[in-house]
């Protein structure tokens, strides 16, 4: 009876359109400005885009943060010193007049939204109306890049009697603030709260959105195995256009899938994925990672390193989530392809192996030496004879020991079960 009364008191919440706040494209383009390996042309376009969006979306707090903190602390000074880069600072230079103009617009809009909240509370309007008013104000703070006020204001709507689904929407908006500023500790905390809410009553659509959010978080913190599972699954159910684009999700799924999936799954879930195939012709980043994936799967070693370098430049470096993992990814993909080639041989000459990859013997010798000492590759180099000898573990011996171990475990369980049965029988007597 109590449950029925509680449910009747909860205000029915009509799901609103999920607004794209903050604008993830602004954050992604701003990241490009800090990368000296990105072309001058790309950074110029990024600067123009960011400034246009700052003006359009009245982002005074973000504009100040961008110019006085982000670009100063994240490497804009590392730009190449050529005749073009001398003017680069001018593209994103702090303009006090523009900032003051944006601040006035912010103050006017915030005042208007606060007055609506005050009127609703004075008129003792329903919980739903008050909650939506707080959400509107919080989303405006999110839009302009005011993280602290956005979180605090959106949090006030959670205290209203709104549905679990509505609360999940609010928490996902708060989580997007963390993605926008690439604060993954913040994101982790908020997504844990979202997951708790979903377990209490999240619908199918919100569960799928959470899957995408958590998948990108896993990508950002280098949990590629979990990211691959979530992002590959998200391809068929993606709706989180407020967080990222479908093209980006496809690229992330391809990167993590290539890194973690075995050959059979790689073929079915990535190479032959209809969702990915439909985007390749129009998505440059996806073309690079797809070419790398196919070269590995088809053992096309001659084209593997060129595609790996292309992926590094076109996919990893420009991505704010993958950039910090770029060198790690390239290193591990070299190890993976070496292991795949050596799997087919007991011995192989360094010259033949170097020729297969289109590199020098000296480079290959040095590169293999990075993986062999710590057993990341099961082989040794015989420099006297110029060959690589594999020393893979004896699979049959390993299988035998595993069988014995599993048999012992089964025998122990059967003995315990037998003792329990005998005890039950004696009790009955």
From Swiss-Prot:
PCI domain location: 223-395
UniProt-annotated location(s): Nucleus
Listed GO CC annotations: nucleus; proteasome complex; proteasome regulatory particle; proteasome regulatory particle, lid subcomplex
GO biological process terms on file: proteasome-mediated ubiquitin-dependent protein catabolic process; ubiquitin-dependent protein catabolic process
Keyword terms, alphabetized: Nucleus, Phosphoprotein, Proteasome, TPR repeat
Further remark: Present with 51900 molecules/cell in log phase SD medium.
Role: Component of the 19S cap proteasome complex which acts as a regulatory subunit of the 26S proteasome, involved in the ATP-dependent degradation of ubiquitinated proteins.
Name assigned to this protein: 26S proteasome regulatory subunit RPN7
Organism: Saccharomyces cerevisiae (strain ATCC 204508 / S288c)
């Amino acid at each position: 009876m109590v449950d029925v009364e509680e449910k009747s008191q909860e205000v029915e919440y009509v799901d609103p359109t999920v607004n794209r706040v903050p604008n993830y494209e602004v954050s992604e383009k701003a990241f490009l400005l800090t990368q000296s390996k990105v072309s001058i042309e790309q950074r110029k376009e990024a600067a123009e885009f960011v400034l246009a969006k700052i003006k359009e979306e009245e982002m005074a707090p973000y504009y100040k943060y961008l110019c006085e903190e982000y670009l100063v602390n994240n490497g804009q000074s590392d730009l190449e010193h050529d005749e073009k880069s001398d003017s680069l600072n001018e593209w994103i230079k702090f303009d006090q007049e523009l900032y003051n103009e944006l601040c006035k617009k912010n103050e006017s809009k915030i005042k208007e939204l606060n007055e609506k909240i005050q009127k609703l509370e004075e008129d003792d309007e329903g919980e739903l109306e008050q909650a939506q008013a707080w959400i509107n104000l919080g989303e405006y703070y999110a839009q302009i890049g005011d993280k602290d006020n956005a979180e605090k204001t959106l949090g006030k709507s959670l205290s209203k009697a709104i549905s679990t689904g509505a609360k999940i929407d609010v928490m996902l908006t708060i989580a997007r603030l963390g993605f926008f500023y690439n604060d993954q500790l913040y994101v982790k905390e908020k997504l844990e709260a979202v997951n708790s809410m979903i377990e209490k009553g999240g619908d199918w659509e919100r569960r799928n959105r959470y899957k995408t959010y958590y998948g990108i978080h896993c990508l950002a913190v280098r949990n590629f195995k979990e990211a691959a599972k979530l992002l590959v699954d998200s391809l068929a159910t993606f709706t989180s256009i407020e967080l990222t684009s479908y093209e980006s999700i496809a690229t992330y799924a391809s990167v993590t899938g290539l890194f973690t999936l075995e050959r059979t799954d790689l073929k079915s879930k990535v190479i032959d994925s209809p969702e990915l195939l439909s985007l390749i012709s129009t998505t440059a980043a996806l073309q690079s990672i797809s070419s790398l994936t196919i070269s590995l799967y088809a053992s096309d070693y001659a084209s593997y390193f060129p595609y790996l370098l292309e992926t590094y430049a076109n996919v990893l470096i420009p991505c704010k989530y993958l950039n910090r993992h770029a060198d790690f990814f390239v290193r591990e993909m070299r190890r993976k392809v070496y292991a795949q080639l050596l799997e087919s041989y007991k011995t192989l000459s360094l010259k033949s192996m170097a020729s297969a990859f289109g590199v020098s013997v000296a480079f290959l010798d040095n590169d293999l030496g990075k993986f062999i000492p710590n057993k990341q590759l099961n082989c040794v180099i015989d420099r006297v004879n110029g060959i690589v000898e594999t020393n893979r573990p004896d699979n049959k011996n390993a299988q035998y020991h595993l069988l014995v171990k599993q048999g012992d475990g089964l025998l122990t369980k059967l003995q315990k079960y037998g003792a329990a049965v005998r005890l039950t029988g004696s009790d009955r007597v």
